[in-house]
Amino acid sequence: MSLSSAFRTVTNDPGIITWRIEKMELVLVPLSAHGNFYEGDCYIILSTRRVGSLLSQNIHFWIGKDSSQDEQSCAAIYTTQLDDYLGGSPVQHREVQYHESDTFRGYFKRGIIYKKGGVASGMKHVETNTYDVKRLLHVKGKRNIRATEVEMSWDSFNQGDVFLLDLGMVIIQWNGPESNSGERLKAMLLAKDIRDRERGGRAEIGVIEGDKEAASPELMTVLQNTLGRRSIIKPAVPDEVTDQQQKSTIMLYHVSDTTGQLSVTEVATRPLVQELLNHDDCYILDQSGTKIYVWKGKGATKVEKQAAMSKALDFIKMKGYPSSTNVETVNDGAESAMFKQLFQKWSVKDQTTGLGKTFSIGKIAKIFQDKFDVTLLHTKPEVAAQERMVDDGNGKVEVWRIENLELVPVEYQWHGFFYGGDCYLVLYTYDVNGKPCYILYIWQGRHASQDELAASAYQAVEVDQQFGGAPVQVRVSMGKEPRHFMAIFKGKLVIYEGGTSRKGNVEPDPPVRLFQIHGNDKSNTKAVEVSASASSLNSNDVFLLWTQAEHYLWYGKGSSGDERAMAKELAELLCDGDADTVAEGQEPPEFWDLLGGKAPYANDKRLQQETLDIQVRLFECSNKTGRFLVTEVTDFTQDDLSPGDVMLLDTWDQVFLWIGAEANATEKEGALSTAQEYLVTHPSGRDPDTPILIIKQGFEPPTFTGWFLAWDPHIWSEGKSYEQLKNELGDATAIVRITTDMKNATLSLNSSESGPKYYPVEVLLKSQDQELPEDVDPTKKENYLSERDFVSVFGITRGQFVSLPGWKQLQLKKEAGLF
């Protein structure tokens, strides 16, 4: 097959294209069979997504556990050719059965099914309406599940997983006693998907709870008739998981094969910086053997680029890692989000921005504007998300200080003054369509005691409970105040390095104080106390030098007019009047005397603000096993927020922890520590003081919902639970009738020398009794139809037909010409 012919289906339209290697040729897999993989084969999958106006493509070649070496080599070659065909920009992935990447599994929301056999044994990907099936599927996983065909025996079962007995016209789900509701729900959705996609909706589904088998005697009879007498079920088998701590260890190697042998040289370990990557070379990034990345520089030769995957496999062999280790190759300038976030920061070069921080979300620049239309924040939550603002800060503000481990209200005139020796709670109330909404900020001073830090967290829970769990909780570390926090104090936020604001404080104020004032409007301005020495100055900012008798407002050469105006307002608040303005370079001698004399300070021209390339990511978090585990959800939607889970949304400069209404108590109580551990163990070496926002299901602010396309606030009230879906399946009567018919047909097949007592439809349609076969009862012609013909003639299964009243059966037989 020519390449142009093999890739003729490739377009820039979003979606998934799957090919199977058949006799060393690429053969397209029908859409209805996507997610089904034969264990004896190799596949190539192309995923195309649009992020704004940009195209993102990923090529995966999948290796079945029983595939031949020739097929694996062929798949690798076709992957390289497809990459060339698409201009060398796609990210390439090597996927091995049972060890697929989160990205790969994320394509198949209903799950992956591993099927026995392959091309060599004549197995084909068939279209819908196939009922000649008899298999047992072992279903594992909770979010992106995998179902493997296993031996039709009770020996295949265990207490912790879900199993589907698929008999074509009947699918029976057996839930292990130790499986959770999420796994059961996903398995049921898989059973429904098999019914609808492969059986045209014409199959019956039944469910057995493994710890309540006596409640489903009819279904258990079907299982035992098929699998034999029930034996003792084996204990649960723990899933193979990699904790976040293991993933946090990364190593960068330079790769060379100039001597004819693979040579790898260690370059650096965590934290990695982007500047380590030379555009003329190739590198391997090793994530503790859990995943291998190969980075191909733009200046590397074509031969070097094409050999990248084989180099990775040689590296895996050299390190003694399992052959199933996941490999991802990325191109210089087209790196995946997962690769970029292994670095301390990843900048987009040659892009100019203003003074504010800029993020490139999916490579589309999102600039934090100084001014924005507040009315857009709730009608367009994506604006709120990008701006990190729920409103303009004009809501109601209440402030408490932790004093003797209790909450003490802070008087209004002291709102906006925060001391490094204290902890505070700030409750912000705003209105959305007549409904009050709340944000609870927990501000923790750098010099606060451990008891006060613990008390602030405890008191936050108390306040949260007073409002029915509605507040969004935001942990704020001193100096890391988010924009909305600054906005509620209207440009009059002052942070003292130490001390306390509590009454009766006997600690004297220092004779000289120096404040660095940063910000250019009322939503982003604050004054932060720094060491009162000349070395603290910076030419790009404004500083206030304060003493009891004198006040100087020092304008650095690089400060803007807006910054100076905001600093002047703040200085008037701190000085109870005007301060003397001093331009950099025109300082009087007493100015330097107060700072202890002149000293070198940062006086370089303001650096152009770099553009950070950030991909917002969603993770499922768990620490209930004692190990901290995170699983990424790729191409996430609101549907991925399951009420039974704790989810983490990482927007880089802040982290949201979303707590589902049905999450277990342990994970709810440990929410903050979960988010903190995520930051500490992040491979890139994240700032542990990154703001953390804790959000409960049903109380999501627009700064959170804006990251999800078409957020639906009613999705959980309208969505169906596992129990509701289970109840919709009906009783077991139809299943028993169908399986009885199937058993009788099998018995007649085994006992009759003349073959099964089924006849073609055209034979049974004959109207004269004498023309019918001798063994056909003319009043019950439907009994002589095969299962497939029965569904074809009546449009329903045999079990559904039998459950109808007699007059309805008669009517259908007349309409079909079988009466």
UniProtKB/Swiss-Prot annotation:
Location of region: Headpiece: 731-819
Entry's Gene Ontology molecular function annotations: actin binding; actin filament binding; Arp2/3 complex binding; phosphatidylinositol-4,5-bisphosphate binding
Residue ranges occupied by any HP domain in the UniProt entry: 753-819
Chain segments carrying region Required for interaction with F-actin: 628-819
Gene3D superfamilies: Severin, Villin headpiece domain
Record-listed a 1,2-diacyl-sn-glycero-3-phospho-(1D-myo-inositol-4,5-bisphosphate) binding positions: 109-116, 135-143
Phosphotyrosine carried by residues: 85, 758
Region of interest (Core), ranges: 1-731
Gelsolin-like repeats: 24-105, 144-215, 265-339, 407-486, 524-592, 631-704
Tissues where this protein is expressed: Expressed in dorsal root ganglion (DRG) neurons and superior cervical ganglia (SCG). Expressed in podocytes.
InterPro entries documented for this protein: ADF-H/Gelsolin-like_dom_sf (IPR029006), Gelsolin-like_dom (IPR007123), Gelsolin-like_dom_sf (IPR036180), Villin/Gelsolin (IPR007122), Villin_headpiece (IPR003128), Villin_headpiece_dom_sf (IPR036886)
Pfam families: Gelsolin, VHP
Keywords: Actin capping, Actin-binding, Calcium, Cell junction, Cell projection, Cytoplasm, Cytoskeleton, Phosphoprotein, Repeat
Biological process annotations from GO: actin filament organization; actin filament severing; actin polymerization or depolymerization; barbed-end actin filament capping; cilium assembly; nervous system development; positive regulation of lamellipodium assembly; positive regulation of neuron projection development
Domain of life: Eukaryota
A cellular component annotation (GO) from this entry: actin filament
Localization per record: Cytoplasm, Cytoskeleton; Cell projection, Neuron projection; Cell projection, Axon; Cell projection, Lamellipodium
Domain remark text: The C-terminal domain is necessary for the induction of long fine actin-containing filopodia-like structures in fibroblast and neurite-like outgrowth.
Subunit details: Associates (via C-terminus) with actin. Interacts with F-actin. Interacts with SCARF1; the interaction occurs in embryonic dorsal root ganglions at 18 dpc and induces neurite-like outgrowth. Interacts with PLCE1. Interacts with ACTR2 and ACTR3; associates with the ARP2/3 complex.
Family: Belongs to the villin/gelsolin family.
The protein's role, per its UniProt record: Ca(2+)-regulated actin-binding protein which plays an important role in actin bundling. May have a unique function in the morphogenesis of neuronal cells which form ganglia. Required for SREC1-mediated regulation of neurite-like outgrowth. Plays a role in regenerative sensory axon outgrowth and remodeling processes after peripheral injury in neonates. Involved in the formation of long fine actin-containing filopodia-like structures in fibroblast. Plays a role in ciliogenesis.
Name of the featured protein: Advillin
Lineage start: Eukaryota, Metazoa, Chordata, Craniata, Vertebrata
Gene that produces this protein: Avil
